């Protein structure tokens, strides 16, 4: 069979992604990626430590990240992204910048991290006050709050799940419930946006529904990572009815078929997390 008329495959541009060893949401990352871009993933080495500040530090050492980036150079990505929120905020703003520099030196290409992309997205959306949802323990959550505050953004509320493993098993319904708690207007006023932290937390399908209910932009770790990386390629992420990506959704756009003031519709669930989690909380 002569297939010469197809002329393909078409040229692809590459984004290298360094993910933590326990990252389980490869498919979610791809959902933000246009057809002409390919993701090339690698993972940090396994360490026998549960999700904690200790783990965040271990998987974000410059030598570890440099080695991971060098494994990607064979496929010549145009940008590399470190897809880990806690690993990129644990060292603060200065530490995040140093991380990007170390990755760029190793791969000779621009580098982004999830936490750096978060701050970039907050600037893009002109956010001065943000509510946070995390799957982390309180100690990890506090470091995220400090990271955001040092960037000049007020944290109006925060809900955390207290998980130390298998974060990818959290359901969309649980994410939505925690988002509502975090977004409640408190003494610091209403939030301009809501951030769903952790690249292992499923968020893609729940973002537009939460934006329609809460009437503020909702951004997530995987979303901002892909948005920032693709931005450096001069291309756009794919995300219908997501305020960060779709400008028409930045003024409280109602989803097609929804009446004004309607509540969050049913969202699909993903497999539940086992009963091995710490006490949930909010501040």
Which stretches of residues belong to each language-model region?
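Short, well-structured alpha-helical segments in soluble
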Residues: 61-75, 177-190
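Periplasmic-binding protein-like
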Residues: 78-83, 131-132, 190-198
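C-terminal functional extensions of proteins
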Residues: 220-257, 280-283
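Compositionally biased, intrinsically disordered low-complexity segments enriched
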Residues: 253-274
């Amino acid at each position: 069979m002569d297939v010469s008329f197809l002329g393909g495959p078409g040229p692809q541009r590459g984004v290298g992604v360094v993910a933590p060893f326990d990252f389980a949401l490869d498919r979610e990352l791809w959902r933000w990626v246009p057809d002409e871009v390919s993701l090339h993933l690698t993972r940090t080495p396994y360490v026998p430590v549960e999700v904690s500040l200790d783990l965040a530090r271990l998987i974000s050492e410059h030598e570890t990240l440099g080695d991971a980036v060098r494994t990607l150079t064979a496929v010549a990505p145009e940008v590399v992204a470190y897809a880990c929120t806690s690993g990129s905020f644990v060292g603060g703003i200065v530490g995040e910048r140093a991380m990007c520099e170390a990755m760029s030196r190793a791969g000779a290409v621009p580098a982004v991290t999830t936490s750096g992309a978060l701050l970039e997205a907050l600037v893009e959306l002109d956010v001065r006050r943000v509510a946070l949802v995390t799957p982390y323990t309180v100690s990890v959550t506090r470091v995220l709050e400090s990271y955001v505050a040092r960037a000049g953004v007020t944290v109006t509320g925060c809900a955390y799940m207290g998980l130390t493993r298998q974060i990818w098993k959290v359901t969309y319904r649980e994410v939505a419930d925690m988002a509502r708690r975090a977004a409640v207007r408190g003494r610091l006023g209403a939030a301009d946006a809501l951030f769903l932290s952790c690249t292992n937390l499923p968020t893609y399908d729940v973002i537009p529904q939460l934006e329609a209910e809460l009437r503020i932009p909702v951004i997530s770790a995987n979303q901002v990572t892909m948005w920032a990386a693709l931005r450096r390629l001069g291309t756009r992420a794919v995300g219908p009815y997501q305020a960060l990506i779709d400008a028409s959704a930045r003024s409280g756009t109602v989803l097609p078929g929804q009446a004004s003031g309607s509540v969050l519709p049913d969202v699909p669930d993903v497999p539940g997390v086992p009963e091995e989690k710490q006490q949930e909380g909010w501040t």
